[in-house]
Curated annotation (Swiss-Prot):
Catalysed reactions, as listed in the record: a glycerophospholipid + a 1,2-diacyl-sn-glycerol = a monoacylglycerophospholipid + a triacyl-sn-glycerol
Positions annotated as glycosylated: N161, N381, N434, N647
PANTHER family, per database record: LECITHIN-CHOLESTEROL ACYLTRANSFERASE-RELATED
SUPFAM superfamilies: alpha/beta-Hydrolases (SSF53474)
Residue ranges crossing the lipid bilayer per the database entry: 55-75
Assigned EC number: 2.3.1.158
Membrane topology: Single-pass membrane protein
UniProt source species: Arabidopsis thaliana
Subcellular location: Membrane
Major place of residence: membrane
Keywords for the protein's UniProt record, in alphabetical order: Acyltransferase, Glycerol metabolism, Glycoprotein, Lipid biosynthesis, Lipid metabolism, Membrane, Transferase, Transmembrane, Transmembrane helix
Name the UniProt record assigns to this protein: Phospholipid:diacylglycerol acyltransferase 1
Active site: S254 (acyl-ester intermediate), D573 (charge relay system), H626 (charge relay system)
Length: 671
């Protein structure tokens, strides 16, 4: 084995002691300096770029997501309920569990009738831009196509502006089955909670039916195009015959209430306009109609929607970001596109206010005059209308009869101080400067500047004049709607003209069926500020295709003021005022009247709104809001008791928190 020779170290030259000291100090400094330079190099070489930061962030999100998903799947199913109960206290049993313990069982078949926008719509035929969307939901679900291809989506969701039916080459149809409207979007229930509770006492698809329809169409056109009314008639007859002859309980919601009013006239009318069921069909097949949030007499919100494509929340957003909503930024679906699309939906005209000034009031009066708006929740279950002495506000009364006012001063002025200049004779024709509006045609372009100014100079519009206003600003749309809907009050219900289907969804121009054993319920929420009248102004934006907008600066800081962001509020469920939801069952149909010749029993059940106490309660079990009320335990229990064989006396007759009976007495209508 070879030897390893070590090299002899070289000897250092001797140095003087003084030099040794200096050398030692330098040697102590050099390692320190070298470590600093090494640290600088490592820092410079390790500096993160933007891509590194993004990757790190995405990695953290993914790891956190997978960790939370692991915990969610690992924890017991009862853990979320345990946490909720520890924070809020024990949860009450759902109505289905409670009534099952009481021994209630499924008896009468139940039919659900969804309202506007809550039912899913899917594509069956479309243009090239919609490739890959066959039988995919265009409305409901995730709404993914709104973001991916907004203009294509608007084109396919619009109807033909002349016929109110399908445009050439496009077929969009209602989703069928209970899944059509159980959830509007993932996690946002509509009918799902009611369906689940009914299942607890034995209901299933053989005795539950979702009467889905294309809610964009006029009611009669759902039969012309899809035979929806015929299928509803056949399904009700089938369920009654296969359930031992037990009559059906009908549960319509929102616009579905008007749709079923139309159906009750259609089913008994002779063919070809009607279903040919005969005058006793409703008496034979229907036990009760339990209307939820029914806009029997229309909603002021429909006027604002057709006039300026706004409601309260949209108006606030438009005021904050006018450039985004009033111009076609990045080719997004902005306000003009919304108006172009919704004005092709005939169904929106079904919810315009009915009864004119007789029902909704005039320049100096309204049924709700003296109503007090409350900023804070009242004690002892009081609603806002009860806050003042004898339900009368100490402040100057709100003129709810003025549905549209141009300026806050006009809304508050005495009738003698208002100088109207009639808009009906104004000459149209001078073009609006913004010629890009032709790409998003809304009929305002054809009015001209003179016509637009004439509308503002008329200053104030009551409910009856608001219909005239819409005829002026959108004559083609309203002409199409006039063939399907009417908004008046019948003088003689025996007149043969009321056999026309356009009157069938107006309870003031039709009779209820001859079915004395049938019951009609009006179930709705109260205690939430609800749109009743609007303060408008001319839109000064040169880029806007919509010349009018809600004047959001018309506002009163007082917490108890009824005027907020250009909107006068009244009691209701946030969408439907109490007057519209309750008047027919409170007075016009109560007992034997010309509108209810057989004396069908009517009941009012109001549910005082109680918002969820915290986020863990979701949308709440005591909500009175227009859609959230579908999860209200008290409402669900009332419906289930009637479906299980009960009647109005079993659920406590009327339950009223608002001033509906007092307000109804102020309406001078021949009964």
């Amino acid at each position: 084995m070879p030897l390893i020779h070590r090299k002899k170290p070289t000897e250092k030259p001797s140095t003087p002691p003084s030099e040794e000291v200096v050398h030692d100090e330098d040697s102590q400094k050099k390692p320190h300096e070298s470590s600093k330079s090494h640290h600088k190099k490592s820092n410079g070489g390790g500096k993160w770029s933007c891509i590194d930061s993004c990757c790190w962030f995405i990695g953290c999100v993914c790891v956190t997501w997978w960790f939370l998903l692991f915990l969610y799947n690992a924890m017991p199913a009862s853990f979320p309920q345990y946490v909720t109960e520890r924070i809020t206290g024990p949860l009450p049993d759902p109505p289905g569990v409670k009534l099952k313990k009481e021994g209630l069982k499924a008896k009468h078949p139940v039919v659900f009738i969804p309202g506007i926008v809550t039912g899913g719509l899917e594509l069956w035929e479309g243009k090239q831009c919609a490739d890959g969307l066959f039988r995919k939901r265009l409305w409901g679900g995730t709404f993914g196509e709104v973001y991916k291809r907004p203009l294509c989506w608007v084109e396919h969701m619009s109807l033909d502006n002349e016929t109110g039916l399908d445009p050439a080459g496009i077929r969009v149809r209602a989703v069928s089955g209970l899944v059509a409207a159980d959830y509007f979007a993932p996690g946002y229930f509509v009918w799902a909670v009611l369906i689940a509770n009914l299942a607890h006492i034995g209901y299933e698809e053989k005795n539950m039916y979702m009467a889905a329809y294309d809610w964009r169409l006029s009611f009669q056109n759902t039969e012309v195009r899809d035979q929806t009314l015929s299928r509803m008639k056949s399904n009700i007859e089938l369920m009654v015959s296969t359930n031992g002859g037990k009559k059906a309980v009908i549960v319509p919601h929102s616009m579905g209430v008007l749709y079923f009013l139309h159906f009750m006239k259609w089913v008994e009318a002779p063919a070809p306009l009607g279903g040919g069921g005969g005058p006793d069909w409703c008496a034979k097949y229907i036990k009760a109609v339990m209307n939820i949030g029914g806009p029997f007499l229309g909603v002021p919100k429909a006027v604002a929607g057709l006039f300026s494509a706004e409601a309260k929340d949209v108006a606030v957003a438009r005021a904050i970001a006018p450039g985004f909503l009033d111009t076609d930024i990045f080719r997004l679906q902005t306000l003009q596109h919304v108006m172009r699309m919704t004005r092709t939906w005939d169904s929106t005209m079904s919810m315009l206010p009915k009864g004119g000034d007789t029902i909704w009031g005039g320049l100096d009066w309204s049924p709700e005059k003296g109503h007090t708006c409350c900023g804070k929740k009242q004690k002892n279950n009081e609603t806002c209308g009860e806050a003042g002495e004898n339900g009368v506000s100490k402040k100057s009364p709100v003129n709810y009869g003025r549905m549209i006012s141009f300026g806050k001063e006009v809304a508050e002025a005495a009738p003698s101080e208002i100088n109207n200049i009639d808009f009906r004779g104004a000459v149209k024709g001078q073009s609006i400067p913004n010629h890009t509006c032709r790409d998003v045609w809304t009929e305002y372009h054809d009015m001209g500047i003179a016509g637009i100014k004439a509308i503002a100079e008329y200053k104030v519009y009551t409910a009856g004049e608001a219909i005239d206003l819409l005829h002026y600003v959108a004559p083609k749309m309203m002409a199409r709607g006039a063939a399907h809907f009417s908004y008046g009050i019948a003088d003689d219900l025996d007149d043969t003209k009321y056999q026309d289907p356009k009157y069938w969804s107006n309870p003031l121009e039709t009779k209820l069926p001859n079915a004395p054993e049938m019951e009609i319920y009006s179930l709705y929420g109260v205690g939430i500020p609800t749109e009743r009248a609007y303060v408008y102004k001319l839109n000064q934006s040169p880029d806007s295709c919509i010349p009018f907008q809600i004047f959001t600066s018309a506002h009163e800081e007082d917490e108890d003021s009824c005027l907020k962001a250009g909107v006068y509020n009244v009691d209701g469920d946030e969408t439907v005022p109490v007057l519209s939801a309750g008047y027919m069952c409170a007075k016009a149909w109560r007992g034997k009247t010309r509108f209810n010749p057989s004396g069908i029993k009517t009941y009012i059940r109001e549910y005082n709104h109680s918002p969820p106490a915290n986020l863990l309660e979701g949308r709440g079990t005591q909500s009175g809001a227009h859609v959230d009320i579908m999860g209200n335990f008290a409402l669900i229990e009332d419906i289930m008791r009637v479906a299980a064989g009960g009647n109005g006396s079993d659920i406590g007759h009327d339950q009223v928190h608002s001033g509906i009976f007092e307000w109804s007495e102020r309406i001078d209508l021949k009964l």
